[in-house]
Amino acid sequence: MNKNYCLTAGLLLVLGLTLIPFGQAAAAPLAKGEPFPAITLPIPKDAEEKNYLGLTGSGVFKITQVKAQALLIEIFSMYCPYCQKDAPRINELFQAIERDPELKGRIKILGLGAGNSAYEVGVYKKTYNVPFPLIPDERLALHQALGETRTPYFILVRLDQGGGRVGDLFGIGRLQRGGILPGDPSKISRV
């Protein structure tokens, strides 16, 4: 009986694996200069965050609706040790942009929690005192549309009337080596 059970279980496993549909291939990472995908994100519930992005109402928004010339999107995960380590530096960058009268309002920052629920994003925001909006992407739909990059990863989107264009892409190492962090946000505006 044990032998029959193992044989039956093995056949069911093979049958099950053959019936599982293969998913679509992962999206290629975005390239500099290409259009930013027309993805929608949930409008933040917090009034300050909504105001910071220049949004009103509730529901969803497109990146091109953000009231800025450029949007720096940080793809992070609550469980990423590099994201945790660098959170204070990204916060410094946010503060430097907000202190600079030439950059405030022109460059905004938005975090995208890859694989994180609203609860996890909230814990990350509270733990690391993140001053800019963070949006959960629990099912990784947005992360996949953006090329399934590692975390942390940054996408600078130039916002214009024709839609958003990718201005630059970089991991935290480049952000640090390029001298953008901490305290020199003017380099972002030249990207």
Regions found by a protein language model. Give the residues of each.
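Bacterial N-terminal signal peptides that target proteins for export
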Residues: 1-11
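Bacterial N-terminal signal peptides
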Residues: 9-20
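Boundary at the C-terminal end of the N-terminal hydrophobic targeting segment
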Residues: 23-27
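A short beta-strand-turn-helix
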Residues: 41-71
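Short pre-active-site segment immediately N-terminal to redox-active cysteine/selenocysteine motifs
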Residues: 69-71, 76-79, 150
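Conserved redox-active cysteine motifs that mediate thiol-disulfide chemistry
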Residues: 75-92
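Conserved segment of the thioredoxin-like fold in thiol-based oxidoreductases
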Residues: 99-138
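Thiol/disulfide oxidoreductase modules built on the thioredoxin-like
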Residues: 126-130, 138-191
